[in-house]
From Swiss-Prot:
Keywords: Developmental protein, Differentiation, DNA-binding, Homeobox, Nucleus, Transcription, Transcription regulation. Expressed in the primitive streak of the gastrulating embryo, and marks cells destined to form mesoderm and endoderm. Present in differentiating embryonic stem cells (at protein level). This is Homeobox protein MIXL1. PROSITE patterns: HOMEOBOX_1, HOMEOBOX_2. GO terms for molecular function: cis-regulatory region sequence-specific DNA binding; DNA-binding transcription activator activity, RNA polymerase II-specific; identical protein binding; protein homodimerization activity; RNA polymerase II cis-regulatory region sequence-specific DNA binding; RNA polymerase II-specific DNA-binding transcription factor binding. Disruption phenotype: Mice display defects in mesendoderm morphogenesis and patterning during development. Embryos show a marked thickening of the primitive streak. By the early somite stage, embryonic development is arrested, with the formation of abnormal head folds, foreshortened body axis, absence of heart tube and gut, deficient paraxial mesoderm, and an enlarged midline tissue mass that replaces the notochord. Development of extra-embryonic structures is generally normal except that the allantois is often disproportionately large for the size of the mutant embryo. Coiled coil: none annotated. Transcription factor that play a central role in proper axial mesendoderm morphogenesis and endoderm formation. Required for efficient differentiation of cells from the primitive streak stage to blood, by acting early in the recruitment and/or expansion of mesodermal progenitors to the hemangioblastic and hematopoietic lineages. Also involved in the morphogenesis of the heart and the gut during embryogenesis. Acts as a negative regulator of brachyury expression. GO terms for cellular component: chromatin; nucleoplasm; nucleus. Residues 86-145 bind DNA.
Amino acid sequence: MAAAGSQQLQFAEGAAFPIFPAAHPGGQLLPAMRPASGLPAAPHDSRAPAATQCFPNRDSSPTAQTPAGLDPPGPSKGSAAPSAPQRRKRTSFSSEQLQLLELVFRQTMYPDIHLRERLAALTLLPESRIQVWFQNRRAKSRRQSGKSFQPLSSRRGVFLHCPAPGTEARCLKPQLPLEADVNHVPDPSMTGGGVCTSGSQSFETYSSLSEDIGSKLDSWEEHIFSALGNF
């Protein structure tokens, strides 16, 4: 039994890993062929690139082909990520600029492009910033009154002179004349020579509010030109 088991084991090993030595037709075994050290190496097969040229759309590298249904790989860590849209810097208005804008807003809440450009020249602010200020001011007025704010006068003929060339770059903050009257504009519903009290002070109303605004703008403009002449 032991001999039969060993024969079966040898037969199984021989069946699993058969060894067939190379033989000459005459029955003699030939030695293994080894390349001579003095002979040059076999040239590269030139037919290999031809097979690739037949299929130009195929790439030999396996990484170039992306499986269907998968997204392409994301950017590497070294590449900079797209920057988020930056928020516009908020413009700060001086007290003189706000007084002039409020003065014009009390006359007309929808200034045209020409009036906005002249305001920009006087306040040294961009015209786009002045337009945004009037939009925000109208929204604030609607929230306070609960209805659309009506302008006190339909007259838009406020004449604002543009400053001389080369003076726009100078940032001036002159004191607005008659600044007390700007914060206490008389009530348009009052007629005649009524008064508008605020605290312990009282101010006489003017016959025409639009003319008063125009005179204040002229005084403010003259004050700017006088300040420019001191330089």
